[in-house]
């Protein structure tokens, strides 16, 4: 009997030992696939990613950022992580989308990481072309700047923002007297208010509808609003020259640049501030998975956020004292396209060319 019990206990002890050993092995197993690396939260995350990235040698980055906005982060990444070269394919988001779709359909995966605006990010998410990820920096980002997936992961995270608001020429209109959208109906704005009819204009209309309702927007027609088929920067120049007294379609960065040159231009955030956001994401498959995740972490780091701020872009991790409004929030890509079309239609109805 004693021998039988001892034998049973020995078998149980071996089973427990094997179970513990198996658990220990599973806990110490290092991630290797893109999905595993993207979800890894170990203390050695950066070290592990860097070692793998150096073995891979490069990262292929698709982005719609322009000029110094992509060159400076690229240089900083290569300086911080020598041995990992950044190869960039840069284009407008619409062209990026076509390229990514074509490559995905052909099962030819060249892209490691993506940085582009939210409409394209939404489209790729809807087509199930993303690998969810986490990052040690994301705890500092508000929920609105992160698209949740399962298990504490995210499909994308906003890494930079641009803000449009009301720019006024102070020789025409006094800045101190302007606080919100309602003030645009005051007599001193009549004949002086202009909108860009590029993307910035319809998004401004969307913000006004969200904050004040469509009836308020229709009241602006009595203000003899002028419409301009030019860029947001060109509209800012019209305000600076005095051709326009004010425009709610001017980016903060453009107004700051013009004001720094001595022009009497002041930028005022309104009830809602339409926010153009760029976000980072991972594709469904990446040829250089370690480098891909390393680049995503880097783009969300305080180091790159400081680079963007130096270039007059905003960080989603900071509070600038106004209420951001992401026009795409709460909509899928089809719904956003429909809403954008409606905003543009209303803008043309209240304006004069």
Regions found by a protein language model. Give the residues of each.
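A ligand-binding cleft/hinge motif common to bilobed small-molecule-binding domains
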Residues: 120-123, 245-264
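Periplasmic-binding protein-like
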Residues: 143, 161-163, 189-196, 200, 219-221, 226-229, 299-321, ...
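A bilobed periplasmic-binding-protein/Venus flytrap-type ligand-binding module shared by bacterial periplasmic
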Residues: 165-172, 208-209, 276-291, 307
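Short, polar/charged alpha-helical segment
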Residues: 42-54, 60, 64-85, 309-313
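Extracytoplasmic ligand-binding site segments that recognize negatively charged/polar headgroups
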Residues: 60-75, 86-104, 108-243
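Bacterial N-terminal signal peptides
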Residues: 10-21
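Extracellular/periplasmic bilobal clamshell ligand-binding domains
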Residues: 304, 319-353
